[in-house]
């Protein structure tokens, strides 16, 4: 889970909010399912569930419009832009009719998730009552659906760092120091950091792993020494820092290019 910036309400929703709300109050129609609402929400979340960060189908097939404050309890907010979030079916179902006003949970467009939850061994733990309630209500430590995917991408991240570090160490020692290997190190590191960006699936997991990985720190130091760590790498790393759900063991932002 990462913080998201909510854009302004779609102009069409501004024009139709009163009419759609009245329609829901009168006959209970699913007025929140308008394509322009779904598309705006998907754009806001980079096509991901705001809670678990799983990828949502681009055609909205598997995306559900989640009401942060439940529509049955707060019907006048049924299409209020600030009450709508894009969610996967699993998270929307787990949250159900939970009243987030009476028992607050994290709203990723309002709160900074890392202030309330942390990651340990690919499981999420609450740092305060809001964080604990969020983890419990959304069942964010479901082993098969969430913890296992985090572990897989975390393991893949660690393996990628190890491969890049080995290439960088050899390059630094003038072993196989070809232009091709240089390009593989540069582009491989760029792609690795892209996986920690807000638009990538499970970006919080990737970012958290990188900022707690000694090999990644070594990789960065060697790349700086060999003058192949560039401004794009630094920018991507700075962006990734905003997504971490751990207290970093290493200050990866030191030794800036």
UniProtKB/Swiss-Prot annotation:
CDD domains recorded: HNHc (cd00085)
InterPro entries per record: HNH, HNH_nuc
Sorted UniProt keywords: Antiviral defense, Hydrolase, Nuclease
Gene Ontology biological process: defense response to virus
Pfam families: HNH (PF01844)
Molecular function (Gene Ontology), one example: nucleic acid binding
Domain of life, source organism: Bacteria
Every HNH domain range: 49-96
Signal sequence residues: none
Role summary: Component of antiviral defense system Septu type I, composed of PtuA and PtuB. Expression of Septu type I in B.subtilis (strain BEST7003) confers resistance to phages SBSphiC and SBSphiJ. May be a nuclease.
Protein name: Septu protein PtuB
Source organism of the structure: Bacillus thuringiensis
Gene responsible for this protein: ptuB
């Amino acid at each position: 889970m990462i913080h998201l910036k909510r854009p302004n309400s779609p102009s069409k929703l501004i024009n139709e909010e009163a009419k759609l709300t009245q329609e829901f109050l009168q006959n209970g129609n699913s007025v929140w399912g308008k394509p322009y609402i779904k598309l705006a929400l998907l754009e806001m979340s980079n096509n991901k569930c705001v809670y678990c960060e799983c990828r949502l189908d681009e055609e909205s097939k598997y995306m559900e419009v989640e009401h942060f404050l439940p529509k049955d309890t707060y019907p006048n907010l049924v299409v209020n832009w600030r009450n709508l979030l894009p969610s996967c079916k699993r998270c929307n179902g787990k949250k159900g009719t939970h009243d987030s006003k009476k028992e607050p949970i994290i709203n990723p467009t309002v709160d900074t998730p890392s202030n309330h939850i942390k990651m340990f061994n690919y499981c999420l733990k609450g740092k305060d009552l809001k964080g604990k309630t969020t983890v419990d209500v959304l069942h964010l430590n479901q082993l098969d659906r969430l913890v296992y995917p985090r572990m897989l991408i975390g393991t893949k991240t660690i393996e990628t760092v190890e491969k890049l570090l080995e290439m960088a160490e050899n390059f630094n020692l003038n072993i196989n120091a070809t232009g091709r290997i240089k390009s593989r190190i540069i582009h491989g590191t760029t792609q690795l950091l892209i996986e920690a960006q807000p638009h990538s699936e499970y970006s919080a997991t990737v970012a958290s792993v990188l900022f707690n990985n000694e090999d990644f720190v070594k990789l960065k130091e060697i790349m700086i020494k060999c003058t192949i760590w560039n401004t794009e790498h630094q920018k991507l790393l700075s962006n990734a820092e905003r997504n971490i759900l751990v207290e970093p063991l290493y200050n990866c932002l030191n030794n800036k290019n």
